[in-house]
Amino acid sequence: MKNKHFYKISSIYTILFLVLLLLSCNSDNNNDAERFKLGIFEIPAGKGYSKTTVKRIDSLQIEEYIKYTEISTDSGVFKKENKVIDTLYIKWKNNFFYTLKMKSPKTELDKDPIFVQINKITKNSYDFTAKIGFSEFKQKGTVYIIE
């Protein structure tokens, strides 16, 4: 009797797991996620960050963006543009999840991995949620294919 009950519950969990697995990546192009692993991409500017150009080659992701620094002088406050290039290691767990790790971290926060979940794929882009380390901070955005 206990075995029957166990198998019934086990079967329900297995079916539930398979349904969740199938629904976990909301996309019309599920089989075409490989096209995001190599190439040149863009993340548009958002609240708190500037437009970022991303180049993926093998296991590296090279990011270029402008960082603004405020400089105070006697005649006023000025914004200085600095072009920043960061190199990160990228490791794909599957077509919908990858981890980024700074090649040369400059701060303690840079040492934490960035976990990225692809939530939705379209013809020329994907929506993602990124989480830094094991913090509760999450950032959502969209990556567009450039080349």
Predicted regions and their residues:
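Edge beta-strand at a domain terminus
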Residues: 83, 133-147
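C-terminal motif of bacterial Sec signal peptides marking the signal peptidase cleavage site
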Residues: 21-24
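An anionic, turn-rich surface loop/hairpin at beta-sheet edges
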Residues: 99-123
